[in-house]
């Protein structure tokens, strides 16, 4: 049976050269959005050459955020861009890594599936990669596959060989190669250099892949003679040398790529006709971005503030809420690993505490939560941010001595936060990767709560990624002191939402709402947060009379 017998979709393979982090994921997402706007069904996938099974245990400082899918996949952040640009939910099967391929390969070898054969990279590894590429097309007209890394990386070679084989077996009528490269600007004269692109294409061609379209990343379009030079020496049509220009907003990319006929050239390659794309919604987004008049400053207190890819979905969700509310969001990044001073918080209009792991930077986050609580500053805590809000309240309001999380101190007197019951270590091997509570869950909200009003419903579905939870033994004592637990999980009875109803806007959620926000449908929790930040700022409700020095953090002595 040939590949064509099992898959009728066209394949668009997006590769990158010269350097990493050029924007392959956004280019792939933009292609998907443009084809979707012409009436086609699309599916996007990411192939990562690293040997981790998934990015779940990788440092955000190296890899960026871990994007969680509805079905519990811990995936590359590019899948978040795919979802935001196309509105098509991805799954854990849309992100494959070399580690996962080798895991499957070795399991098959141990079962005897290769009995009698010498297991090799070619054909056994490449066959598994090809199987992933072709699987579960769900009736898509186009499957867009982004290959992580850079052409020339040793670890990328099996993936590049796999897509070469797919193209050979399907024929050029069903595959197209889009290669993104860098055209650097060198010297004080600002000379644009095309030689790195030529070498990158030469490297790709040596592996049996001839790019059909070259996207060159640059601050400005190349002069015609330089564009023609790339076409000539890289063996592509001059019409297929297309700029991938720096833009102020990523949401300008589909409009820009269409203006340079990227989608037109792709369809021409396949000999397919289609109506012009309806880009009205993209134009509307850009109008909203440009028309925001009110400005608020929101402090994000985290430990990866030098690596902003760690918070991609978070900052995008803030921007979505802001653009739909006519508000420009200025983010003030505060490194929680450094001493957080009152001067870091005195000029902010809102505080956001993101998720995280480990005790590094916890005191800075707790101090910021306490300062926001005591001074009427809107505060949104997500995942660990919610857990720390409960700990801060226990220390400073309920006066519970040595209130803490067992993640940070197993021997604390008052464990406000504990490991999920079904994850607590017992006999045998303890696996860290892939063992958290992951994916979409159903939550029930108190009918009279602020958060139910925000959602307009008492039953919601959100994505989670956590190993720890609020200790139910402390629910009553914290409620007696004024903290409300207004959301519970449908299946396990866990505390999922807390709020302080005496505060202008103070909400913590165990789940990750940022994963379900889009530029066309901002998440209601972020919208409420941003709008209340502006309203409270304009009304002057924040008094900022309580000093940050008065806030107790874990390990502090409680003064009765």
Curated annotation (Swiss-Prot):
PROSITE patterns: GATASE_TYPE_1. One of its GO terms (biological process) is pyrimidine nucleobase biosynthetic process. Residues 1-272 are annotated as: Amidoligase domain. L-glutamine binds at residues 356, 384-387, 407, 467. The active site is at 383 (nucleophile), 512, 514. GO terms for molecular function: ATP binding; CTP synthase activity; glutaminase activity; identical protein binding; metal ion binding. GO terms for cellular component: cytosol. Keywords: ATP-binding, Glutamine amidotransferase, Ligase, Magnesium, Metal-binding, Nucleotide-binding, Pyrimidine biosynthesis. CTP binds at residues 20, 153-155, 193-198, 229. Allosterically activated by GTP, when glutamine is the substrate; GTP has no effect on the reaction when ammonia is the substrate. The allosteric effector GTP functions by stabilizing the protein conformation that binds the tetrahedral intermediate(s) formed during glutamine hydrolysis. Inhibited by the product CTP, via allosteric rather than competitive inhibition. Its EC number is 6.3.4.2. Mg(2+) binds at residues 78, 146. UTP binds at residues 20, 193-198, 229. CTPSs have evolved a hybrid strategy for distinguishing between UTP and CTP. The overlapping regions of the product feedback inhibitory and substrate sites recognize a common feature in both compounds, the triphosphate moiety. To differentiate isosteric substrate and product pyrimidine rings, an additional pocket far from the expected kinase/ligase catalytic site, specifically recognizes the cytosine and ribose portions of the product inhibitor. Belongs to the CTP synthase family. Catalyzes the ATP-dependent amination of UTP to CTP with either L-glutamine or ammonia as the source of nitrogen. Regulates intracellular CTP levels through interactions with the four ribonucleotide triphosphates. This is CTP synthase. It comes from Anaplasma marginale (strain Florida).
């Amino acid at each position: 049976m040939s590949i064509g017998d099992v898959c009728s979709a066209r394949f668009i393979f997006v590769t990158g050269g010269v350097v990493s982090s050029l924007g392959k994921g956004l280019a792939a997402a933009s292609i998907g959005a443009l084809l979707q706007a012409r009436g086609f069904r699309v599916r996007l996938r990411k192939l990562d050459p690293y040997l981790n099974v998934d990015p779940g245990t990788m440092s955000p400082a190296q890899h960026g955020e871990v994007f969680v899918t509805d079905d519990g996949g811990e995936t590359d952040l590019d899948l978040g861009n795919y979802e935001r640009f196309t509105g098509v939910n991805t799954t854990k099967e849309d992100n494959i890594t070399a580690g996962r391929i080798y895991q499957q390969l070795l399991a098959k070898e141990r079962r005897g599936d290769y009995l009698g054969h010498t297991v090799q990279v070619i054909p056994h590894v490449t066959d598994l990669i090809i199987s992933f590429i072709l699987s579960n097309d769900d009736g898509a007209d186009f499957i867009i596959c982004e290959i992580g890394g850079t052409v020339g990386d040793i670890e990328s070679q099996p993936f590049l060989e796999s897509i070469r084989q797919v193209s050979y077996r399907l024929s050029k009528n069903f595959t197209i190669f889009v290669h993104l490269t860098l055209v650097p600007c060198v010297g004080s004269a600002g000379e644009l250099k095309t030689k790195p692109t030529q070498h990158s294409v030469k490297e790709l061609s040596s592996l049996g892949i001839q790019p059909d379209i070259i996207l060159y990343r640059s601050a400005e379009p190349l002069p015609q003679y330089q564009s023609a030079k790339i076409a000539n020496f890289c063996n592509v049509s001059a019409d297929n040398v297309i700029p991938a220009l720096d833009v102020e907003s990523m949401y300008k990319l589909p409009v820009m790529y269409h203006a340079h006929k990227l989608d037109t050239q792709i369809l021409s390659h396949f000999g397919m006709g289609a109506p012009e794309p309806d880009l009205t919604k993209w134009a509307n987004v850009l109008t909203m971005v440009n028309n925001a008049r009110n400005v608020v400053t929101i402090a994000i207190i985290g430990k990866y503030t030098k690596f902003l890819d760690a918070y991609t979905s978070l900052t995008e969700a803030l921007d979505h809420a802001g653009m739909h509310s006519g508000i420009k969001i200025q983010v003030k990044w505060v490194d929680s690993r450094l001493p957080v001073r009152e001067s870091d918080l005195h000029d902010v209009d809102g505080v956001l505490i993101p998720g995280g792991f480990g005790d590094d930077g916890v005191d800075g986050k707790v101090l910021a939560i306490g300062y926001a609580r005591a001074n009427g500053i809107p505060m949104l805590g997500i995942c660990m941010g919610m857990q720390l809000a409960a700990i801060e309240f226990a220390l400073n309001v309920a006066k519970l001595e040595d209130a803490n999380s067992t993640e940070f101190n197993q021997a604390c007197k008052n464990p406000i936060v504990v490991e999920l019951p079904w994850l607590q270590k017992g006999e045998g091997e303890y696996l860290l990767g892939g063992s958290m509570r992951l994916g979409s869950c159903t939550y029930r909200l108190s009918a009279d709560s602020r958060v139910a009003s925000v959602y307009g419903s008492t039953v919601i579905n959100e994505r989670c990624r956590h190993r720890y939870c609020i200790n139910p033994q402390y629910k009553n004592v914290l409620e007696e002191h004024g903290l409300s637990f207004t959301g519970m999980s449908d299946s396990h009875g866990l505390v999922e939402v807390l709020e302080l109803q005496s505060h202008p806007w103070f909400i913590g959620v165990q789940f990750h709402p940022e994963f379900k926000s889009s530029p066309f449908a901002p998440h209601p929790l972020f919208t409420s947060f941003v709008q209340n930040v502006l309203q409270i700022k304009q009304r002057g409700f924040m008094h900022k009379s309580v000093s940050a020095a008065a806030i107790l953090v874990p390990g502090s002595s409680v003064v009765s």
